[in-house]
């Protein structure tokens, strides 16, 4: 790992623990095992370092795709939710800190949520394709279903360890349980073969 990446990783850990004000360049330099001169030569300022940190976070955010033509909506959504949840849980501390400082540093919170926001658009588009393919009820309000699922995932990832017996158990089955509710909300008939639903939609 080169010096720049090492400093960014250190800044991520220190920021998650101490917030922007508490994440001094001295603490970050110690965590990265470099001196402050090296830190400033690399980034120029603390503000520039944190801009780079947020940009790096977004660049590294895995936003899983959903298929253009669905073969198995339940499996596809369950896999997708599982991957998004894993990313949110992995970055729980960083997200909490950014949201907690939203009043003081709104730009950082918005940047931190760009990945989930993009994921929400991908999910909405997928649900509309399910409607067009005859796999979901055309009258369902997709945006509301998407908002409910994204909110559930965000709350689960950020608050599960603080709110006992509030979220689906066991944790490993949460994705499947959330999707089970979404499937019913969308009016997806699990028992109906996909090719028959598509044929009916084309009539």
Stretches found by the model and what they are:
Residues 51-80:
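Amphipathic alpha-helical linker/stalk segments
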Residues 62-66, 96-98, 109-112, 139, ...:
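Short, hydrophobic secondary-structure boundary micro-motifs
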Residues 1-18, 22-37, 41, 48:
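Basic, helix-initiating cap at the start of DNA-binding domains
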Residues 186-203:
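C-terminal effector-binding regulatory domain of bacterial HTH transcription factors
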Residues 20-21, 108, 136:
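Conserved hydrophobic residue
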Residues 55, 77-100, 104, 109-110, ...:
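Helical hydrophobic small-molecule/effector-binding pocket
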Residues 86, 90, 107-133, 143-147, ...:
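Amphipathic alpha-helical packing segments from all-alpha helical-bundle domains
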